[in-house]
């Protein structure tokens, strides 16, 4: 099950209580204090793991707590430290304060380990309180309480290329033929109900990650359809590929303008991201001469519009996933854009 948003109450462990104890030996009737310290409470850590792809393992868990420190013992034996709580999360997980909305942690790197909540310090045993005026202190410190915080874990998939389009335009088919992803494919809207990642291998030495998200509809940025819930997954994609469908009831230009508008309303950063355009189902030109002419007119209308906007796109290509035409060219075009962005990020 794909889960990308959970709420949790996290607590570090309480420090153990220091011991009040005195030496008990046969020939020492009034032995001095020998109370050990309480153990520190366990910490709470977040660990980034690429082998984990969802937050589903937190489903049904509302409160998670590290172990408390053990109390101190006699004979100057300290209590055992509480076991820390290590929370394994996928790459791209944000830890957000549930009240303020502040992003507290951003887990981006494989193996990244972050201390989130420090455990309470263990209390001192009565040994520490012996002095010249009090040789037998009968008190010790209580342990310090751990910390508690309500958080929201939010997963944003990290990919090089994000597919953007209306439902049932061919995004899932595309990612299934160019990558190792195997999404459900059917001829009805919202087949893709969860985001999918696929590795696209261009040749023996070059590859990139592609993300397919549920289709966006007009009003997605205002909460309509499934789009709003998953739009955040393309926030971390380096390059966007708009997938346009000649078989829809609206023109290619209308599709493009609505999709761009929804991205702009959701995030100004997404709106300014580099993008390419792909006309899917180009094999539908075989549906008849009249349709072929309409499709060509639509295509030329969008090209003219893009030209009037100073061609903001990196490329515009026709592809048929069914007939596998244009796929090789598309992969190399996308790789070129991904390489440009990677090089810029390394400067």
UniProtKB/Swiss-Prot annotation:
GO terms for molecular function: GTP binding; GTPase activity; magnesium ion binding. GO terms for biological process: ribosome biogenesis. It is found in: Cytoplasm. Its cofactor is Mg(2+). GTP binds at residues 165-172, 190-194, 212-215, 280-283, 320-322. GO terms for cellular component: cytoplasm. Residues 159-339 form the OBG-type G domain. InterPro entries: G_OBG (IPR031167), GTP-bd (IPR006073), GTP-bd_Obg/CgtA (IPR014100), GTP1-OBG_CS (IPR006074), GTP1_OBG_dom (IPR006169), GTP1_OBG_dom_sf (IPR036726), OBG_GTPase (IPR045086), P-loop_NTPase (IPR027417). Residues 1-158 form the Obg domain. The keyword Magnesium applies. It is an enzyme of class 3 (hydrolase). Its EC number is 3.6.5.-. Mg(2+) binds at residues 172, 192. The keyword Magnesium applies. Keywords: Cytoplasm, GTP-binding, Hydrolase, Magnesium, Metal-binding, Nucleotide-binding. Monomer. Belongs to the TRAFAC class OBG-HflX-like GTPase superfamily. OBG GTPase family. An essential GTPase which binds GTP, GDP and possibly (p)ppGpp with moderate affinity, with high nucleotide exchange rates and a fairly low GTP hydrolysis rate. Plays a role in control of the cell cycle, stress response, ribosome biogenesis and in those bacteria that undergo differentiation, in morphogenesis control. This is GTPase Obg.
């Amino acid at each position: 099950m794909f889960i990308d948003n959970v709420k949790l109450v996290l607590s570090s462990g309480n420090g153990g209580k220091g011991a009040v104890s005195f030496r008990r030996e046969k020939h020492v009737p009034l032995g001095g204090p020998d109370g050990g310290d309480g153990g520190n409470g366990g910490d709470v850590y977040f660990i980034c793991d690429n082998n984990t792809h969802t937050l589903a393992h937190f489903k049904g868990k509302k409160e998670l707590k590290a172990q408390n420190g053990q109390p101190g013992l006699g004979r100057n034996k300290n209590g055992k430290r509480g076991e820390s709580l290590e929370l394994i999360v996928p790459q791209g997980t944000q830890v957000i304060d549930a009240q303020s909305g502040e992003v507290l942690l951003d887990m981006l790197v494989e193996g990244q380990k972050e201390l989130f909540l420090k455990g309470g310090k263990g209390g001192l045993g009565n040994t520490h309180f012996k002095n010249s005026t009090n040789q037998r202190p009968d008190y010790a410190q209580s342990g310090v309480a751990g910390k508690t915080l309500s958080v929201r874990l939010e997963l944003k998939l990290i990919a090089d290329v994000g597919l953007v389009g209306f439902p049932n335009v061919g995004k899932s088919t595309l990612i299934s033929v160019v990558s190792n992803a195997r999404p459900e494919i059917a001829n009805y809207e919202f087949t893709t109900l969860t985001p999918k990642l696929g590795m696209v291998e261009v040749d023996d030495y070059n590859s990139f990650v592609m993300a397919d998200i549920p289709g966006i509809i007009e009003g997605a940025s205002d909460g309509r359809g499934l789009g709003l819930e998953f739009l955040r997954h393309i926030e971390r994609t380096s390059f966007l590929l708009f997938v346009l469908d000649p078989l829809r009831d609206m023109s290619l230009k209308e599709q493009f303008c609505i999709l761009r508008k929804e991205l702009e309303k959701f995030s100004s950063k997404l709106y300014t991201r580099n993008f390419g355009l792909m006309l899917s189902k180009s094999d539908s030109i075989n549906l008849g001469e009249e349709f072929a002419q309409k499709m060509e007119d639509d295509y030329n209308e969008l090209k003219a519009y893009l030209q009037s906007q100073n061609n903001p796109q990196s490329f515009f290509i026709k592809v048929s996933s069914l007939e596998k035409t244009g796929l090789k060219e598309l992969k190399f075009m996308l790789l070129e854009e991904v390489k440009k962005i990677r090089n810029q990020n390394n400067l």
